[in-house]
Amino acid sequence: MFLSDEQDYIGRCILVLKRHCGSLPGLTDGEWKDLRKLVCKVENGLKTVFGAALCNWSCLMNGFYKEAEPNPHLHIHVRPRYAKPVLLNGNVYPDGEFGHHYAVKKSGTISDADRREVFVRLKEWMEREK
């Protein structure tokens, strides 16, 4: 799991399969079970730590197919959504699109200190909830 560089939605992460796999149907039964556990853990963390009302999960493989010889690698995006603004280090981040689909071109500028705060708080949750 990686914290996305783009924090257009506070806590936005990407889950990446450790081995190469080109699509969801390629997951083993054990990987499906592990994915479910991880989805539950991450979503609970985002709700508990930052107050997310819900999380949108997506497996977007389109970018790989821009290449002449596509070689997709399974990864899943999580975009937490917030009914109430997120407060980080005194800065307020409202989710002005709450209740609507996410914007493809939304800017996610947050300060380096706030990005670090998101990373630390989410990492602490993930390590505590093993």
Annotated model-derived regions:
Residues 1-130:
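HIT superfamily nucleotide-processing domains
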